[in-house]
Protein backbone atom coordinates (compact mmCIF):
# COMPACT_ATOMS: atom_id res chain seq x y z
CA UNK A 1 0.00 0.00 0.00
CA UNK A 2 1.43 3.37 -0.91
CA UNK A 3 1.70 6.20 1.59
CA UNK A 4 -0.86 8.18 -0.41
CA UNK A 5 -3.51 5.43 -0.40
CA UNK A 6 -2.87 4.67 3.28
CA UNK A 7 -3.20 8.36 4.13
CA UNK A 8 -6.48 8.64 2.23
CA UNK A 9 -7.85 5.53 3.96
CA UNK A 10 -6.93 6.93 7.38
CA UNK A 11 -8.43 10.33 6.54
CA UNK A 12 -11.68 8.70 5.44
CA UNK A 13 -11.85 6.63 8.64
CA UNK A 14 -11.19 9.69 10.83
CA UNK A 15 -14.01 11.57 9.08
CA UNK A 16 -16.34 8.58 9.50
CA UNK A 17 -15.58 8.28 13.23
CA UNK A 18 -15.97 12.03 13.84
CA UNK A 19 -19.36 11.88 12.14
CA UNK A 20 -20.34 8.88 14.28
CA UNK A 21 -19.47 10.54 17.61
CA UNK A 22 -20.98 13.83 16.45
CA UNK A 23 -17.99 16.03 17.19
CA UNK A 24 -14.38 16.60 16.38
CA UNK A 25 -11.67 15.36 18.75
CA UNK A 26 -9.55 17.99 20.41
CA UNK A 27 -6.02 16.99 21.30
CA UNK A 28 -3.58 18.22 23.94
CA UNK A 29 0.10 17.42 23.43
CA UNK A 30 2.37 16.74 26.41
CA UNK A 31 6.12 16.69 25.82
CA UNK A 32 7.53 14.84 28.81
CA UNK A 33 11.21 15.28 27.95
CA UNK A 34 11.44 14.11 24.36
CA UNK A 35 14.13 14.92 21.80
CA UNK A 36 11.37 16.59 19.71
CA UNK A 37 11.53 13.99 16.92
CA UNK A 38 8.01 12.75 17.71
CA UNK A 39 6.77 16.31 18.21
CA UNK A 40 7.87 17.22 14.69
CA UNK A 41 5.99 14.21 13.29
CA UNK A 42 2.84 15.22 15.20
CA UNK A 43 3.06 18.66 13.59
CA UNK A 44 3.62 16.98 10.21
CA UNK A 45 0.34 15.09 10.68
CA UNK A 46 -1.41 18.47 10.99
CA UNK A 47 0.22 20.06 7.92
CA UNK A 48 -1.54 20.30 4.54
CA UNK A 49 -0.14 16.98 3.29
CA UNK A 50 -1.96 14.98 5.99
CA UNK A 51 -4.30 17.72 7.22
CA UNK A 52 -5.86 16.06 10.25
CA UNK A 53 -7.29 19.48 11.18
CA UNK A 54 -9.59 19.24 8.16
CA UNK A 55 -11.59 16.68 10.16
CA UNK A 56 -11.48 18.72 13.33
CA UNK A 57 -8.51 16.96 14.93
CA UNK A 58 -7.20 20.09 16.57
CA UNK A 59 -4.44 20.84 19.03
CA UNK A 60 -5.75 22.79 22.01
CA UNK A 61 -3.87 24.88 24.56
CA UNK A 62 -5.40 23.38 27.68
CA UNK A 63 -5.98 19.80 28.82
CA UNK A 64 -9.36 20.95 30.15
CA UNK A 65 -10.58 21.21 26.54
CA UNK A 66 -9.07 17.95 25.28
CA UNK A 67 -10.58 14.59 24.42
CA UNK A 68 -7.23 13.00 23.58
CA UNK A 69 -3.81 13.37 25.20
CA UNK A 70 -0.75 12.80 23.01
CA UNK A 71 2.30 12.11 25.17
CA UNK A 72 5.85 12.12 23.83
CA UNK A 73 9.11 11.57 25.67
CA UNK A 74 10.40 9.22 28.37
CA UNK A 75 8.69 11.08 31.28
CA UNK A 76 11.63 12.69 33.02
CA UNK A 77 11.65 13.10 36.78
CA UNK A 78 11.02 16.83 36.25
CA UNK A 79 7.92 16.20 34.11
CA UNK A 80 6.42 13.33 36.13
CA UNK A 81 4.05 15.39 38.30
CA UNK A 82 3.05 17.57 35.34
CA UNK A 83 2.06 14.49 33.31
CA UNK A 84 -0.10 13.24 36.20
CA UNK A 85 -1.67 16.69 36.64
CA UNK A 86 -2.47 17.04 32.93
CA UNK A 87 -4.09 13.60 32.98
CA UNK A 88 -6.24 14.58 35.98
CA UNK A 89 -7.21 17.91 34.36
CA UNK A 90 -8.44 16.24 31.17
CA UNK A 91 -12.19 15.64 31.39
CA UNK A 92 -13.71 12.19 30.98
CA UNK A 93 -14.10 10.47 28.65
CA UNK A 94 -10.46 10.79 27.67
CA UNK A 95 -8.02 8.80 25.61
CA UNK A 96 -4.23 8.72 26.07
CA UNK A 97 -1.95 8.01 23.13
CA UNK A 98 1.74 7.28 23.79
CA UNK A 99 3.64 8.55 20.73
CA UNK A 100 7.11 7.17 20.04
CA UNK A 101 9.54 4.67 21.46
CA UNK A 102 10.20 6.61 24.68
CA UNK A 103 6.72 6.61 26.25
CA UNK A 104 5.76 3.21 24.80
CA UNK A 105 8.71 1.27 26.19
CA UNK A 106 11.42 3.59 27.44
CA UNK A 107 13.72 3.27 24.42
CA UNK A 108 17.31 4.12 25.33
CA UNK A 109 16.08 5.61 28.61
CA UNK A 110 14.57 2.35 29.90
CA UNK A 111 15.38 1.93 33.61
CA UNK A 112 17.31 5.19 33.70
CA UNK A 113 17.24 6.77 37.17
CA UNK A 114 16.20 10.05 35.52
CA UNK A 115 13.13 8.81 33.64
CA UNK A 116 9.92 6.97 34.43
CA UNK A 117 9.07 5.26 31.14
CA UNK A 118 7.05 3.45 30.00
CA UNK A 119 4.11 5.82 30.33
CA UNK A 120 1.59 3.14 31.31
CA UNK A 121 3.38 2.78 34.65
CA UNK A 122 2.23 6.35 35.43
CA UNK A 123 -1.16 6.87 33.77
CA UNK A 124 -3.49 4.57 31.82
CA UNK A 125 -2.59 4.44 28.12
CA UNK A 126 -5.19 3.51 25.51
CA UNK A 127 -3.12 3.52 22.31
CA UNK A 128 0.60 2.93 21.74
CA UNK A 129 2.24 4.32 18.58
CA UNK A 130 5.81 2.96 18.51
CA UNK A 131 8.64 4.31 16.40
CA UNK A 132 11.59 6.63 16.74
CA UNK A 133 10.01 8.79 15.51
CA UNK A 134 6.75 7.32 14.20
CA UNK A 135 5.64 8.42 10.74
CA UNK A 136 2.62 10.74 10.45
CA UNK A 137 0.65 7.80 8.97
CA UNK A 138 1.34 5.80 12.14
CA UNK A 139 0.21 8.74 14.28
CA UNK A 140 -2.99 9.07 12.23
CA UNK A 141 -3.57 5.32 12.64
CA UNK A 142 -3.20 5.83 16.40
CA UNK A 143 -5.78 8.63 16.21
CA UNK A 144 -8.16 6.24 14.40
CA UNK A 145 -7.74 3.66 17.18
CA UNK A 146 -8.26 6.40 19.78
CA UNK A 147 -11.41 7.64 18.05
CA UNK A 148 -12.80 4.10 17.94
CA UNK A 149 -12.30 3.80 21.71
CA UNK A 150 -13.67 7.31 22.30
CA UNK A 151 -16.75 6.48 20.22
CA UNK A 152 -17.42 3.43 22.39
CA UNK A 153 -17.10 5.57 25.54
CA UNK A 154 -19.32 8.40 24.28
CA UNK A 155 -22.00 6.44 22.44
CA UNK A 156 -21.88 3.23 24.43
CA UNK A 157 -21.79 1.27 21.20
CA UNK A 158 -19.24 0.03 18.72
CA UNK A 159 -18.72 2.39 15.77
CA UNK A 160 -19.41 1.05 12.27
CA UNK A 161 -16.59 -0.80 10.57
CA UNK A 162 -14.51 0.89 7.93
CA UNK A 163 -16.55 1.21 4.75
CA UNK A 164 -19.92 0.92 6.51
CA UNK A 165 -22.15 3.98 6.60
CA UNK A 166 -23.43 5.68 9.74
CA UNK A 167 -27.18 5.73 10.16
Curated annotation (Swiss-Prot):
User: Which residues of the sequence carry a binding annotation for [4Fe-4S] cluster?
Assistant: 35, 38, 102, 132
Matching SUPFAM superfamilies, A to Z? HydA/Nqo6-like (SSF56770)
Q: Quote a single Gene Ontology cellular component term.
A: ferredoxin hydrogenase complex
Q: Which molecular function term from Gene Ontology is one that the record holds?
A: ferredoxin hydrogenase activity
Q: How is its activity regulated?
A: Inhibited by 0.1 mM Cu(2+).
Catalytic EC class: oxidoreductase
Biological process terms in GO annotation: proton motive force-driven ATP synthesis
| Activity over temperature | Optimum temperature is 90 degrees Celsius for membrane-bound enzyme but 80 degrees Celsius for the purified enzyme. Membrane-bound enzyme has a half-life of 2h at 100 degrees Celsius whereas the half-life of the purified enzyme is 30 minutes at 100 degrees Celsius.
Annotated signal sequence is none
Q: Where in the cell is it found?
A: Cell membrane
EC? 1.12.7.2
Q: Which InterPro entries match?
A: Complex_I_20kDa-like, NADH_UbQ_OxRdtase-like_20kDa
Q: How does activity depend on pH?
A: Optimum pH is 7.0. Active between pH 6.0-8.5.
Kindly state which keywords UniProt assigns to this record, in alphabetical order: 4Fe-4S, Cell membrane, Iron, Iron-sulfur, Membrane, Metal-binding, Oxidoreductase
- The principal location of this protein is membrane
The job of this chain, per UniProt, is described as: Probable subunit of a hydrogen-evolving hydrogenase that utilizes protons both as a substrate for hydrogen production and proton translocation. Acts by coupling the redox reaction via ferredoxin and iron-sulfur (Fe-S) clusters to proton translocation across the membrane, thereby conserving the redox energy in a proton gradient.
Subunit composition? Answer: The membrane-bound hydrogenase complex is composed of MbhK and MbhL, but may also contain MbhJ.
NCBIfam families referenced in this protein's UniProt entry, alphabetically: PRK06411.1
| Name of the protein in its database record | Probable membrane-bound hydrogenase subunit mbhJ
Origin species: Pyrococcus furiosus (strain ATCC 43587 / DSM 3638 / JCM 8422 / Vc1)
> What gene is this protein translated from?
mbhJ
Amino acid sequence: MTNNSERKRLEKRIAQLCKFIGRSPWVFHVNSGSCNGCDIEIIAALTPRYDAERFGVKLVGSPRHADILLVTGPVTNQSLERVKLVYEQTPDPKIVIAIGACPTGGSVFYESPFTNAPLDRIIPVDVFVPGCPPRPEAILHGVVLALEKLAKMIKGEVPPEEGEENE
